[in-house]
Protein backbone atom coordinates (compact mmCIF):
# COMPACT_ATOMS: atom_id res chain seq x y z
CA UNK A 1 0.00 0.00 0.00
CA UNK A 2 1.06 3.60 -0.50
CA UNK A 3 2.91 5.34 2.25
CA UNK A 4 0.37 6.94 4.59
CA UNK A 5 2.42 9.93 5.65
CA UNK A 6 3.79 12.63 3.41
CA UNK A 7 4.60 16.32 3.22
CA UNK A 8 5.31 18.69 0.38
CA UNK A 9 9.04 17.99 0.17
CA UNK A 10 9.44 14.53 1.61
CA UNK A 11 10.07 11.60 -0.78
CA UNK A 12 8.61 9.27 1.88
CA UNK A 13 5.41 9.03 -0.15
CA UNK A 14 7.07 6.60 -2.54
CA UNK A 15 7.80 4.16 0.29
CA UNK A 16 5.40 1.60 1.73
CA UNK A 17 6.58 2.03 5.32
CA UNK A 18 8.50 4.51 7.41
CA UNK A 19 12.27 4.09 7.58
CA UNK A 20 14.86 5.10 10.13
CA UNK A 21 16.06 7.86 7.79
CA UNK A 22 12.53 9.30 7.60
CA UNK A 23 12.13 9.05 11.37
CA UNK A 24 15.38 10.97 11.80
CA UNK A 25 14.01 13.78 9.61
CA UNK A 26 10.78 13.99 11.58
CA UNK A 27 12.44 13.80 15.00
CA UNK A 28 15.64 15.79 14.53
CA UNK A 29 14.86 18.07 11.58
CA UNK A 30 11.18 18.70 12.45
CA UNK A 31 9.91 17.48 9.09
CA UNK A 32 6.11 17.96 9.09
CA UNK A 33 3.58 15.21 8.44
CA UNK A 34 0.28 15.02 6.60
CA UNK A 35 -1.99 12.05 6.04
CA UNK A 36 -2.52 10.95 2.45
CA UNK A 37 -5.98 10.36 0.95
CA UNK A 38 -5.22 6.64 0.68
CA UNK A 39 -4.41 6.55 4.34
CA UNK A 40 -7.62 8.30 5.32
CA UNK A 41 -9.56 5.81 3.24
CA UNK A 42 -7.86 2.90 4.99
CA UNK A 43 -8.73 4.34 8.40
CA UNK A 44 -12.36 4.87 7.38
CA UNK A 45 -12.70 1.32 6.04
CA UNK A 46 -11.40 -0.12 9.31
CA UNK A 47 -13.62 2.12 11.44
CA UNK A 48 -16.82 1.50 9.48
CA UNK A 49 -16.22 -2.25 9.35
CA UNK A 50 -15.81 -2.36 13.14
CA UNK A 51 -18.86 -0.17 13.71
CA UNK A 52 -21.03 -2.61 11.77
CA UNK A 53 -19.32 -5.81 12.95
CA UNK A 54 -19.43 -4.96 16.67
CA UNK A 55 -23.19 -4.36 16.80
CA UNK A 56 -24.28 -7.77 18.04
CA UNK A 57 -20.99 -9.36 19.16
CA UNK A 58 -18.92 -9.55 22.32
CA UNK A 59 -15.56 -7.93 21.57
CA UNK A 60 -12.89 -7.33 24.20
CA UNK A 61 -12.56 -3.73 25.30
CA UNK A 62 -15.62 -2.57 23.37
CA UNK A 63 -18.40 -4.13 25.41
CA UNK A 64 -16.34 -5.98 28.05
CA UNK A 65 -14.18 -4.89 30.95
CA UNK A 66 -10.38 -4.84 30.70
CA UNK A 67 -7.81 -7.43 31.75
CA UNK A 68 -9.26 -9.95 34.24
CA UNK A 69 -12.53 -7.96 34.13
CA UNK A 70 -13.03 -9.02 30.52
CA UNK A 71 -15.55 -11.59 31.79
CA UNK A 72 -17.98 -8.78 32.59
CA UNK A 73 -20.25 -7.32 29.93
CA UNK A 74 -20.58 -3.55 29.58
CA UNK A 75 -24.07 -2.32 28.78
CA UNK A 76 -24.68 -0.21 25.69
CA UNK A 77 -25.28 3.04 27.56
CA UNK A 78 -21.81 2.80 29.17
CA UNK A 79 -19.69 1.94 26.11
CA UNK A 80 -18.40 5.45 25.51
CA UNK A 81 -17.69 6.01 29.20
CA UNK A 82 -15.65 2.79 29.23
CA UNK A 83 -13.20 4.28 26.73
CA UNK A 84 -12.69 7.41 28.84
CA UNK A 85 -12.36 5.32 32.01
CA UNK A 86 -9.42 3.25 30.76
CA UNK A 87 -7.50 6.45 30.01
CA UNK A 88 -8.22 8.21 33.30
CA UNK A 89 -7.71 5.11 35.44
CA UNK A 90 -4.34 4.28 33.89
CA UNK A 91 -2.83 7.79 33.75
CA UNK A 92 -1.04 7.07 37.03
CA UNK A 93 2.65 7.36 36.16
CA UNK A 94 5.40 8.52 38.50
CA UNK A 95 8.86 10.03 38.29
CA UNK A 96 10.42 12.54 35.95
CA UNK A 97 8.70 13.37 32.65
CA UNK A 98 10.02 11.54 29.62
CA UNK A 99 12.07 13.90 27.42
CA UNK A 100 9.97 15.50 24.70
CA UNK A 101 11.88 13.82 21.88
CA UNK A 102 10.99 10.37 23.22
CA UNK A 103 7.32 11.30 23.57
CA UNK A 104 7.25 12.66 20.03
CA UNK A 105 8.74 9.38 18.80
CA UNK A 106 6.12 7.46 20.79
CA UNK A 107 3.32 9.48 19.16
CA UNK A 108 4.74 8.72 15.71
CA UNK A 109 4.87 5.03 16.62
CA UNK A 110 1.26 5.07 17.86
CA UNK A 111 0.15 6.89 14.73
CA UNK A 112 1.76 4.21 12.59
CA UNK A 113 -0.07 1.46 14.44
CA UNK A 114 -3.35 3.17 13.54
CA UNK A 115 -2.26 3.68 9.92
CA UNK A 116 -2.04 -0.07 9.45
CA UNK A 117 -5.86 -0.02 9.37
CA UNK A 118 -6.11 -2.82 11.94
CA UNK A 119 -7.39 -0.87 14.94
CA UNK A 120 -10.83 0.38 13.91
CA UNK A 121 -10.21 3.90 15.23
CA UNK A 122 -11.85 7.03 13.87
CA UNK A 123 -9.73 9.03 11.42
CA UNK A 124 -10.01 12.13 13.63
CA UNK A 125 -7.75 10.42 16.18
CA UNK A 126 -4.93 10.02 13.64
CA UNK A 127 -5.42 13.61 12.48
CA UNK A 128 -5.17 14.97 16.03
CA UNK A 129 -2.00 13.00 16.78
CA UNK A 130 -0.53 14.38 13.55
CA UNK A 131 -1.37 17.92 14.71
CA UNK A 132 0.36 17.28 18.04
CA UNK A 133 3.49 16.09 16.23
CA UNK A 134 3.59 18.97 13.75
CA UNK A 135 2.79 21.73 16.25
CA UNK A 136 5.25 20.57 18.91
CA UNK A 137 2.54 19.76 21.45
CA UNK A 138 4.13 17.12 23.67
CA UNK A 139 2.10 15.24 26.30
CA UNK A 140 3.46 15.15 29.84
CA UNK A 141 4.36 11.48 30.32
CA UNK A 142 5.96 10.28 33.60
CA UNK A 143 8.79 7.80 33.05
CA UNK A 144 7.69 5.07 35.50
CA UNK A 145 4.59 2.90 35.59
CA UNK A 146 4.53 0.23 32.87
CA UNK A 147 6.59 -2.86 32.10
CA UNK A 148 5.35 -3.47 28.57
CA UNK A 149 3.90 -6.96 29.06
CA UNK A 150 0.41 -5.56 28.48
CA UNK A 151 1.70 -2.74 26.36
CA UNK A 152 2.95 0.62 27.62
CA UNK A 153 -0.36 1.16 29.37
CA UNK A 154 0.48 3.95 31.79
CA UNK A 155 2.65 6.02 29.47
CA UNK A 156 0.22 5.69 26.57
CA UNK A 157 -2.66 6.60 28.90
CA UNK A 158 -0.92 9.91 29.65
CA UNK A 159 -0.66 10.56 25.91
CA UNK A 160 -4.33 9.60 25.49
CA UNK A 161 -5.30 11.91 28.35
CA UNK A 162 -4.03 14.92 26.40
CA UNK A 163 -5.83 13.81 23.23
CA UNK A 164 -9.14 14.08 25.10
CA UNK A 165 -8.17 17.55 26.30
CA UNK A 166 -7.12 16.63 29.84
CA UNK A 167 -3.79 16.42 31.66
CA UNK A 168 -0.78 18.54 30.77
CA UNK A 169 1.49 19.12 27.79
CA UNK A 170 4.81 20.79 27.09
CA UNK A 171 4.38 23.55 24.55
CA UNK A 172 6.89 26.19 23.48
CA UNK A 173 9.13 25.36 26.42
CA UNK A 174 6.44 25.46 29.12
CA UNK A 175 4.32 22.85 30.90
CA UNK A 176 0.67 23.85 30.54
CA UNK A 177 -2.88 22.55 30.83
CA UNK A 178 -3.79 20.67 27.68
CA UNK A 179 -7.18 22.36 27.27
CA UNK A 180 -5.70 25.86 26.94
CA UNK A 181 -3.03 24.73 24.45
CA UNK A 182 -5.65 22.99 22.29
CA UNK A 183 -7.84 26.10 22.34
CA UNK A 184 -4.87 28.30 21.45
CA UNK A 185 -4.17 26.08 18.42
CA UNK A 186 -7.81 25.81 17.34
CA UNK A 187 -7.92 22.06 18.06
CA UNK A 188 -10.84 20.12 19.50
CA UNK A 189 -10.37 17.35 22.09
CA UNK A 190 -11.04 13.90 20.64
CA UNK A 191 -14.48 12.39 21.30
CA UNK A 192 -14.68 8.61 21.72
CA UNK A 193 -16.47 6.52 19.10
CA UNK A 194 -15.95 2.75 19.53
CA UNK A 195 -12.63 1.64 21.04
CA UNK A 196 -10.19 4.56 20.78
CA UNK A 197 -9.46 4.69 24.53
CA UNK A 198 -8.23 1.11 24.54
CA UNK A 199 -6.51 1.49 21.19
CA UNK A 200 -4.37 4.45 22.24
CA UNK A 201 -3.28 2.84 25.52
CA UNK A 202 -2.75 -0.72 24.27
CA UNK A 203 0.61 -1.35 22.60
CA UNK A 204 4.38 -0.99 22.41
CA UNK A 205 4.60 2.53 21.02
CA UNK A 206 6.42 4.19 23.93
CA UNK A 207 9.16 1.58 24.18
CA UNK A 208 9.42 1.59 20.39
CA UNK A 209 9.68 5.39 20.27
CA UNK A 210 12.34 5.41 22.99
CA UNK A 211 14.14 2.60 21.17
CA UNK A 212 14.15 4.54 17.89
CA UNK A 213 15.71 7.61 19.50
CA UNK A 214 18.28 5.51 21.38
CA UNK A 215 19.17 3.66 18.19
CA UNK A 216 19.79 6.93 16.35
CA UNK A 217 22.04 8.09 19.20
CA UNK A 218 23.86 4.73 19.27
CA UNK A 219 24.51 4.87 15.52
CA UNK A 220 26.05 8.33 15.95
CA UNK A 221 28.22 7.04 18.79
CA UNK A 222 29.41 4.17 16.64
CA UNK A 223 30.46 6.48 13.80
CA UNK A 224 32.35 8.67 16.26
CA UNK A 225 33.99 5.58 17.76
CA UNK A 226 35.23 4.50 14.32
CA UNK A 227 36.63 7.96 13.60
CA UNK A 228 38.28 8.21 17.02
CA UNK A 229 39.78 4.74 16.62
CA UNK A 230 41.35 5.71 13.29
CA UNK A 231 42.81 8.83 14.91
CA UNK A 232 44.19 6.72 17.76
CA UNK A 233 46.02 4.55 15.26
CA UNK A 234 47.33 7.65 13.52
CA UNK A 235 48.68 8.94 16.83
CA UNK A 236 50.36 5.58 17.42
CA UNK A 237 51.61 5.41 13.80
CA UNK A 238 50.22 1.86 13.63
CA UNK A 239 50.71 -0.52 10.75
CA UNK A 240 47.47 -0.40 8.78
CA UNK A 241 47.03 -4.04 7.75
CA UNK A 242 44.69 -4.76 10.69
CA UNK A 243 42.00 -2.86 8.76
CA UNK A 244 42.88 -4.37 5.37
CA UNK A 245 40.22 -6.01 3.22
CA UNK A 246 41.97 -9.42 2.88
CA UNK A 247 42.35 -9.78 6.66
CA UNK A 248 38.77 -8.83 7.47
CA UNK A 249 37.26 -10.77 4.55
CA UNK A 250 38.86 -13.85 6.13
CA UNK A 251 36.23 -13.59 8.86
CA UNK A 252 32.65 -13.86 7.63
CA UNK A 253 30.95 -11.25 9.78
CA UNK A 254 29.28 -8.35 7.99
CA UNK A 255 29.86 -5.97 10.89
CA UNK A 256 33.59 -6.60 11.06
CA UNK A 257 33.96 -6.13 7.32
CA UNK A 258 31.90 -2.92 7.35
CA UNK A 259 33.82 -1.39 10.28
CA UNK A 260 37.12 -2.17 8.52
CA UNK A 261 35.78 -0.57 5.32
CA UNK A 262 34.74 2.54 7.26
CA UNK A 263 38.19 2.73 8.84
CA UNK A 264 39.89 2.47 5.44
CA UNK A 265 37.64 5.26 4.19
CA UNK A 266 38.55 7.45 7.19
CA UNK A 267 42.29 6.81 6.84
CA UNK A 268 42.53 7.19 3.08
CA UNK A 269 45.38 9.53 2.19
CA UNK A 270 46.74 9.65 5.73
CA UNK A 271 50.51 9.97 6.14
CA UNK A 272 50.34 8.97 9.81
CA UNK A 273 49.84 5.20 9.54
CA UNK A 274 52.53 2.83 8.35
CA UNK A 275 52.69 0.18 5.64
CA UNK A 276 54.10 -3.06 6.96
CA UNK A 277 55.47 -3.99 3.53
CA UNK A 278 57.50 -0.77 3.43
CA UNK A 279 59.22 -1.38 6.77
CA UNK A 280 59.07 -4.92 8.13
CA UNK A 281 58.83 -6.84 4.86
CA UNK A 282 61.80 -5.18 3.14
CA UNK A 283 64.51 -7.48 4.55
CA UNK A 284 66.48 -4.63 6.11
CA UNK A 285 65.70 -5.19 9.81
CA UNK A 286 68.62 -6.75 11.68
CA UNK A 287 68.04 -5.36 15.20
CA UNK A 288 67.23 -7.76 18.06
CA UNK A 289 64.63 -5.52 19.72
CA UNK A 290 62.35 -3.42 17.54
CA UNK A 291 61.76 0.17 18.58
CA UNK A 292 58.31 0.46 16.98
CA UNK A 293 55.43 -1.84 17.97
CA UNK A 294 55.24 -4.77 15.55
CA UNK A 295 51.56 -5.09 16.50
CA UNK A 296 49.51 -2.34 18.18
CA UNK A 297 47.64 -3.00 21.43
CA UNK A 298 44.25 -4.70 21.21
CA UNK A 299 42.40 -1.42 21.82
CA UNK A 300 43.94 -0.10 18.60
CA UNK A 301 44.31 -3.24 16.51
CA UNK A 302 41.06 -5.12 17.18
CA UNK A 303 38.63 -2.33 16.29
CA UNK A 304 36.85 -4.29 13.50
CA UNK A 305 36.43 -7.29 15.81
CA UNK A 306 35.16 -5.14 18.72
CA UNK A 307 32.94 -2.66 16.88
CA UNK A 308 31.84 -5.24 14.29
CA UNK A 309 29.42 -6.95 16.71
CA UNK A 310 28.18 -3.49 17.75
CA UNK A 311 27.47 -2.68 14.10
CA UNK A 312 25.63 -5.99 13.62
CA UNK A 313 23.52 -5.36 16.72
CA UNK A 314 22.58 -1.87 15.52
CA UNK A 315 21.48 -3.38 12.21
CA UNK A 316 19.34 -5.96 13.98
CA UNK A 317 17.90 -3.36 16.34
CA UNK A 318 16.92 -1.26 13.34
CA UNK A 319 15.21 -4.24 11.71
CA UNK A 320 13.22 -5.06 14.86
CA UNK A 321 12.24 -1.46 15.64
CA UNK A 322 11.24 -0.64 12.06
CA UNK A 323 9.20 -3.85 11.87
CA UNK A 324 7.53 -2.90 15.16
CA UNK A 325 6.74 0.69 14.24
CA UNK A 326 5.15 -0.50 10.98
CA UNK A 327 3.03 -3.09 12.81
CA UNK A 328 -0.38 -3.12 14.42
CA UNK A 329 0.57 -3.54 18.10
CA UNK A 330 -3.01 -3.46 19.28
CA UNK A 331 -5.57 -5.92 20.61
CA UNK A 332 -7.93 -7.03 19.29
CA UNK A 333 -6.89 -6.75 15.64
CA UNK A 334 -9.64 -5.39 13.39
CA UNK A 335 -9.27 -6.83 9.89
CA UNK A 336 -11.61 -5.47 7.21
CA UNK A 337 -9.94 -7.71 4.59
CA UNK A 338 -11.11 -10.93 6.25
CA UNK A 339 -14.17 -9.28 7.83
CA UNK A 340 -13.18 -10.46 11.28
CA UNK A 341 -11.82 -9.31 14.64
CA UNK A 342 -8.99 -11.35 16.16
CA UNK A 343 -8.04 -11.49 19.85
CA UNK A 344 -4.40 -12.10 20.78
CA UNK A 345 -1.33 -10.41 22.22
CA UNK A 346 0.18 -8.01 19.67
CA UNK A 347 0.55 -5.48 22.51
CA UNK A 348 3.36 -7.55 24.05
CA UNK A 349 6.75 -5.84 24.10
CA UNK A 350 9.32 -8.65 24.13
CA UNK A 351 10.65 -7.99 20.63
CA UNK A 352 11.57 -4.43 21.56
CA UNK A 353 12.74 -5.16 25.12
CA UNK A 354 14.99 -8.03 24.00
CA UNK A 355 16.56 -5.76 21.40
CA UNK A 356 17.06 -2.90 23.84
CA UNK A 357 18.81 -5.24 26.29
CA UNK A 358 21.16 -6.21 23.47
CA UNK A 359 21.62 -2.57 22.47
CA UNK A 360 22.70 -1.74 26.04
CA UNK A 361 25.36 -4.44 25.84
CA UNK A 362 26.55 -3.09 22.48
CA UNK A 363 26.82 0.51 23.74
CA UNK A 364 28.62 -0.73 26.87
CA UNK A 365 31.18 -2.52 24.69
CA UNK A 366 31.65 0.66 22.69
CA UNK A 367 32.23 2.63 25.90
CA UNK A 368 34.68 0.02 27.21
CA UNK A 369 36.72 0.35 24.02
CA UNK A 370 36.82 4.14 24.43
CA UNK A 371 37.99 3.75 28.04
CA UNK A 372 40.84 1.44 27.01
CA UNK A 373 41.87 3.86 24.27
CA UNK A 374 41.92 6.74 26.78
CA UNK A 375 44.02 4.54 29.07
CA UNK A 376 46.49 4.04 26.20
CA UNK A 377 46.70 7.79 25.58
CA UNK A 378 47.19 8.74 29.24
CA UNK A 379 49.93 6.26 30.15
CA UNK A 380 53.31 7.13 28.69
CA UNK A 381 54.74 3.72 29.60
CA UNK A 382 52.10 2.09 27.42
CA UNK A 383 52.11 4.40 24.41
CA UNK A 384 55.80 5.34 24.58
CA UNK A 385 55.25 8.55 22.61
CA UNK A 386 53.28 10.99 24.78
CA UNK A 387 53.98 12.64 28.16
CA UNK A 388 52.08 11.25 31.19
CA UNK A 389 48.37 12.10 31.02
CA UNK A 390 49.08 14.02 27.80
CA UNK A 391 50.34 17.07 29.71
CA UNK A 392 52.79 19.15 27.72
CA UNK A 393 55.05 20.44 30.51
CA UNK A 394 55.66 20.44 34.26
CA UNK A 395 54.20 16.96 34.48
CA UNK A 396 55.59 16.43 38.00
CA UNK A 397 53.56 19.41 39.26
CA UNK A 398 50.23 18.21 37.84
CA UNK A 399 48.90 15.91 40.54
Locate each region found by the language model.
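Accessory "access/gating" subregions that flank catalytic or transport cores
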Residues: 234-368
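Active-site cavity-forming subdomains of large catalytic enzyme subunits
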Residues: 91, 95, 105-253
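Glycine-rich loop at the start of a catalytic domain that most often binds anionic cofactors/ligands
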Residues: 68-83
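N- or domain-start disorder-to-order transition segments that initiate the globular core
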Residues: 9-56
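Short, hydrophobic/aliphatic alpha-helical segments
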Residues: 40-58, 128-143, 185-190, 195, ...
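Conserved small/polar residues in nucleotide/adenosyl-binding loops
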Residues: 1-8, 395-399
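C-terminal catalytic subdomain
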Residues: 350-398
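Conserved phosphate/anionic-ligand binding catalytic regions in large, soluble enzymes, centered on
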Residues: 58-71, 143-162, 346-370
Amino acid sequence: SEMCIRDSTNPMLAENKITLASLYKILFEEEPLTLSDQCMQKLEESFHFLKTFSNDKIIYGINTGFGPMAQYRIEDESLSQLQYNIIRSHATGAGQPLPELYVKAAMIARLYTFLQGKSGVHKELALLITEFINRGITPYVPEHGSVGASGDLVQLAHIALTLIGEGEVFYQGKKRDTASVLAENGLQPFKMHIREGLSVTNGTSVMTGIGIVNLIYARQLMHWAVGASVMMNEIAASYDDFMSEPLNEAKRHEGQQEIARMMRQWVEGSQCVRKRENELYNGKHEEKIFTHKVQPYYSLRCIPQILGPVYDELLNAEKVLINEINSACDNPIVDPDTQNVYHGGNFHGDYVSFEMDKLKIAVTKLAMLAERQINYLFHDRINGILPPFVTVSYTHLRA
